[in-house]
Amino acid sequence: MKQYFSFQWHITDDCDQRCKHCYIFSENTCKHLDSMSWERMQETFYNCLDFCEVHNRLPYFYITGGDPILHPDFWQLLGLLKQYGIPFTILGNPFHLNDAVCQRLKNYGCEKYQLSIDGLRETHDWFRKPGSFDTTLEKIGCINRAGIRSVVMTTVSGKNIDEVPGIIDAVVAAGANVFAFARYCPTSEEKDTGIEPLRYRQLLADCDKKFKEYEAAGCTTYFNKKDHLWTLYEYETGTFKIPEGIEDGMIYGGCNCGNCHLTILPTGDVYACRRVQNSKVANVFEDRLADVWVCQMEQYRDYTRFEKCSKCELLAFCRGCPAVASGKTGNFYATDPQCWKEVK
């Protein structure tokens, strides 16, 4: 059976918000806003299909921006995806959603729509813009009514870590189908997320307790434990056990960079991971993605180079978040700054 390969495709930088932690403007607040032309979008699409044909994968697209719905050819692109029967998720804003728009998305084959909540009302609106918090929670209902799975993602940093339990309550009350959080990735060397390792472990413990309480009460929200440090936490608490008979040198879980995804920006630049700022490997208008995968991407598959993880029994299952490590040090294989495990 073929496995899916995901393309996170940023079709435009256009957006109704200017979030303080946005990667688009992280190093250049006066950056020109790029958008991919319809001709280039078709070229990109067929390059991705060629990749999947060569490597025997099924394509899956995460269409994003900016806010992708602002692209003048957004609906035309969805028509192309529908023509080929390819499933997709939208990562976008809430501001242009209503029942009719969400139903139209569903008709084109949209499976999930991901929104962001990055704090309780005051903090979230400070990150994004006034009114964003309430609008985001309100639009969860539009997404659900259309039969699309509503996903809420939180980016955790020192600014909002204390609010995460409250965010979970708000998201559950709004009826979100899925909730997940990941850590903010510093966007140039020596920046820090401002979270001590044991403080982050405590967040996982607090959330684990809350998730279990909601699940026991029949809550329908699925809590996606996205951060790979959950594996370490569950290993310590006995929920996760290393299976017997595992193959030496085989990777069974953890970060998927170099395994099953690529990121494409509006300029055509291809990144191993959007959150790793120095991970540009190609340009989709100039390079064949199928070749990039077995050439330039090899540098992200040398698991023996992980400075700390290579000495840990969880290497094949965890590896933390290399993007966070890279954001702090510039080194993809450096120690995850929030990993609390002592490894000798």
Predicted regions and their residues:
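Conserved alpha-helical substructure of the radical SAM core
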Residues: 1-111
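Radical SAM enzyme [4Fe-4S]-AdoMet core and its adjacent flexible, acidic
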Residues: 10, 31-32, 36, 108-112, ...
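Short loop/turn motifs at secondary-structure junctions
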Residues: 18, 57, 109, 175-177, ...
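Positions that flank functional sites
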Residues: 27, 96, 120, 158, ...
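Hydrophobic/aromatic residues in well-formed alpha-helices
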Residues: 41, 200-203, 289
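Active-site metal-binding loops of divalent metal-dependent hydrolases
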Residues: 66-68, 94-95, 119, 252, ...
